[in-house]
A protein has these predicted regions:
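N-terminal leader/linker segments that initiate helical-solenoid repeat arrays
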Residues: 15, 20-60, 64, 193
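Short helix-capping/linker turns of helical repeat alpha-solenoids
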Residues: 30, 43, 60-62, 75-77, ...
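Hydrophobic face of amphipathic alpha-helices that form TPR/SEL1-like repeat modules
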Residues: 35, 41-42, 57-58, 66-75, ...
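Structural signature of tandem alpha-helical TPR/SEL1-like repeats
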Residues: 45-50, 80-89, 116-125, 152-161, ...
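Alpha-helical solenoid scaffolds that mediate protein-protein interactions
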Residues: 57-58, 93, 129, 165
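Alpha-helical adaptor scaffolds
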Residues: 71, 75, 84, 88-132
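Terminal, low-structured helical/coil segments at or just beyond the last alpha-helical repeat
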Residues: 152-155, 159, 163-193
Length: 193
């Protein structure tokens, strides 16, 4: 009689213990935010090695931490400069929905920081960030489309992108917008008998 009761108690204890263990710190958004904030604090006082360590500890579950790791890899802050690893980390954060990471990745590809400049590869990342309202990405994507460096020129889309950046207060976008040729006048509809 004691054996089944003891076994039931042990099973209940194990189930309770296991369910309590299933909730790890990785599952706690508040803890992740506290860790992230401590990384920001370390970065702000230029303790880059500590900031990099902190952001790296949560980069598997926080896209902003991924982006910060990428930025630090890009600049060589708190770690060795590694543009290729920065691009990979920016891509992960951008795929996680962070427009800033998409803008940063597009900028790196456009400038050729990890290889030759590649406006064609940069354009989709910049367009994604621009569609989320990122003004620098809108300006850079507009330039690519205005100049036709990634394919055919597209002045109509460049104009829209420059407008996004100009609306955010970017003077260069305002100047580029003003320098574009006027939009072609719409032709009146043709009537057919």
């Amino acid at each position: 009689m004691k054996t089944p009761l003891l076994r039931a108690i042990v099973i209940c204890f194990c189930v309770s213990f296991a369910s309590g263990c299933a909730s790890s710190p990785e599952d706690d958004p508040k803890l992740t935010k506290q860790i992230f904030d401590s990384g920001v604090a370390a970065y702000d006082v230029k303790n880059y090695a500590e900031a990099f360590r902190i952001f790296s500890s949560i980069d598997d579950r926080d896209v902003a931490a991924m982006r910060n790791v990428a930025l630090m890899l890009r600049k060589g802050e708190g770690t060795a400069k590694d543009p290729k690893a920065a691009e990979e980390m920016y891509a992960r954060a951008a795929q996680g929905g962070l427009a800033t990471a998409a803008a940063d990745l597009g900028d790196m590809l456009l400038k050729g920081e990890a290889g030759p400049p590649d406006p064609k590869a940069a354009l989709p990342w910049l367009m994604g960030a621009a569609s989320a309202g990122h003004p620098v990405a809108a300006l850079e994507a507009g330039q690519i489309l205005e100049e036709g460096t990634a394919g055919p020129k597209d002045l109509a889309t460049a104009r829209k992108l420059y407008q996004i950046a100009a609306d955010a207060g970017m003077d260069e976008a305002k100047q580029r917008l003003a320098a574009l040729p006027p939009e072609p006048a719409a032709l009146p509809p043709t009537e057919h008998p």
